[in-house]
Amino acid sequence: MAPDDSAIPARVVTSLPLAFTAGAAVGALGGMIGLGGAEFRLPLLIGLFGFAALAAVILNKAMSLIVVLTALPARLATVPPADLGAHWTVVVNLLAGSLLGAWAGASWAVRMRGATLYKVLAALMVLMAAALVLTHTATVGALPLPGPVRAVAGVAAGFGIGVVAAIMGVAGGELLIPTIVLLYAIDIKVAGSLSLLVSLPTMLVAFARYSRDGSFAVLRSNLRFTVTMVAGSIAGALLGGLLLGVIPDRVLIPALAVILLISAAKLARHAPPDARQAGLPDN
């Protein structure tokens, strides 16, 4: 389908200094809670920089992938390989669902009308806010599930997380880490490293699906912007890591949850003039 000009934002801002600054702010927020911050970057891509929903999701996914690749060596170095190897079945169990979920989620995203995608993203932002509060204020304990039930639950949870990660363009660590702790009774530090091993192939599958629709055109036309914002995100994440614990969780977590909820409200009202996605080929 030819691009519908009515759905293309009137003004896309690609200022490199602004991109770096916004990326740094997002990285710092994520770094202070041990995450990448992609859920905070998505509403900025739409609201501040003016990208249409699907374009913003694809850009966010690209940036999330680079941030994960950058963080992977350092994160894996904090956990002995033997500890990770002992839990390889957990990674396989979750990937069995998340890879399918990533493909399905990306397929749904490219087929959704623009107005629908904005509302879906808003709902998922609310989900992320709830997950943020629950995982940082409540003690997550393992569920006493029989082996076969746990395996089925792992596939189902992986599928759901893969869908969410693909549609939002995030790595999914916000949901993967508590899931690993809850289903498999694994220490949260090890769970963080295992989540990266699940996130990376899951994101690659979502990319593969998006590329079938020519959606990567937004990356080619905004390459400098993407690289600059990623550089800011990485710098911000390092700063956020240094600030870890400076702001008490009882203050930081509710504040971040409120930011997500405000972003969700704005996304829900951010419907394009035409319901199809801006400037991206149809299937």
Question: Model-predicted segments: where are they?
Answer:
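Residue-level recognition of oxygen-bearing side chains
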Residues: 40, 61, 175, 196, ...
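Alpha-helical transmembrane segments and their lipid-water interface positions
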Residues: 38, 64-75, 105, 202-210, ...
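Non-catalytic alpha-helical scaffold/packing segments enriched in small hydrophobic residues
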Residues: 154, 175-179, 199, 203
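Transmembrane helix-bundle signature of multi-pass membrane transporters/permeases
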Residues: 57-65, 192-202
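Juxtamembrane transmembrane-helix boundary motif
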Residues: 1-28, 46-48, 53-55, 73-166, ...
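Generic structural signal for well-ordered secondary structure
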Residues: 38, 59-62, 66, 89, ...
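Single transmembrane alpha-helix segments in multi-pass membrane proteins
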Residues: 27-28, 33-35
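Transmembrane helix boundary and interhelical junction motifs in multipass membrane proteins
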Residues: 34-41, 167-179
